[in-house]
Structure formats: structure tokens, C-alpha cells
């Protein structure tokens, strides 16, 4: 994985963990959890591309893998919608910067996962 992506994930997660949004901390904690899961999934998918044994294993369980991939894209879409929703409501510049960066990162990760998935198919 690109070291900039790792740094971006860590930076955004650290910033989000310090925030107290007006909506609720439960929503923010849910977003943080989803970001962490997405990072782990993206890392494991990238590592699978580097190991041929894992690549063949993924191809052998193709139906399950496609369902997992579909679920991850749903999670990404949910996170994008949540970031956009927060951006429309907040006037705090720290929150705006954080969620704009989170939105950009989500779009980059979605693109990377699509690229990996096309290579695995």
C-alpha cells in the first residue's frame, strides 16, 4: 500500500477520534469503525495481489469474494454520504478540512479497490 494512503488513514482516524460532532458521537464512532475496517480490507486486498497463492484462493471462492467486494462498495458509498452530510452541516473549519480529506481518501480507495478487483477477476 502507498505510504501516503497509510498516513492519510491514520491522520483522518486520529482527527475524527478527537472530534465531538453535534449530531452524535455514536455516528462518528460508527464512521471511525467503518474507516478502520475499510483500511484493513484494502490492505489485505493489496497484499493478496502480491501473493499468488492468495490470488488463486480468492479466485476459487469467487462468489463469496464478490459478495464481500459488493459489501465494501456499499460501505464506501455510506461513508461518502456521511462525509457529505457532515460537510453540509458543519461550519467548523477543522471538521470541514478533515471530512474533505476523508472524502478524497474514500474516492481514492474506492478507485484502488476497483483496480485490484478488476485484476483479480
Swiss-Prot record:
Signal peptide: none
Keywords noted in UniProt: Host nucleus, Host-virus interaction, Transport, Virion
Cellular component GO terms, alphabetical: host cell nucleus; virion component
InterPro entries for this protein: Flu_NS2 (IPR000968)
GO annotation terms (biological process): exit of virus from host cell nucleus through nuclear pore
One Pfam assignment: Flu_NS2
Compartments (UniProt record): Virion; Host nucleus
Keyword Transport: yes
Renumbered ranges of motif Nuclear export signal: 12-21, 85-94
Sections of the chain in a coiled coil: none
Function description: Mediates the nuclear export of encapsidated genomic RNAs (ribonucleoproteins, RNPs). Acts as an adapter between viral RNPs complexes and the nuclear export machinery of the cell. Possesses no intrinsic RNA-binding activity, but includes a C-terminal M1-binding domain. This domain is believed to allow recognition of RNPs bound to the protein M1.
Record HAMAP family: INFV_NEP (MF_04067)
Subunit annotation: Interacts with protein M1. May interact with host nucleoporin RAB/HRB and exportin XPO1/CRM1.
Record-stated family: Belongs to the influenza viruses NEP family.
The name this protein goes by in its record: Nuclear export protein
Organism lineage: Viruses, Riboviria, Orthornavirae, Negarnaviricota, Polyploviricotina
Amino acid at each position: 500500500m502507498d505510504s501516503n494512503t497509510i498516513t492519510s488513514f491514520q491522520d483522518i482516524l486520529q482527527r475524527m477520534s478527537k472530534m465531538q460532532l453535534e449530531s452524535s458521537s455514536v455516528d462518528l464512532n460508527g464512521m471511525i469503525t467503518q474507516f478502520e475496517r475499510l483500511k484493513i480490507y484494502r490492505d489485505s486486498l493489496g497484499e493478496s495481489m502480491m501473493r499468488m497463492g492468495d490470488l488463486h484462493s480468492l479466485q476459487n471462492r469467487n462468489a463469496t469474494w464478490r459478495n464481500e467486494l459488493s459489501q465494501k462498495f456499499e460501505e464506501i458509498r455510506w461513508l461518502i454520504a456521511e462525509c457529505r452530510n457532515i460537510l453540509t452541516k458543519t461550519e467548523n473549519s477543522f471538521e470541514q478540512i478533515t471530512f474533505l480529506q476523508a472524502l478524497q481518501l474514500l474516492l481514492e480507495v474506492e478507485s484502488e479497490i476497483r483496480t485490484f478487483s478488476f485484476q483479480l477477476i
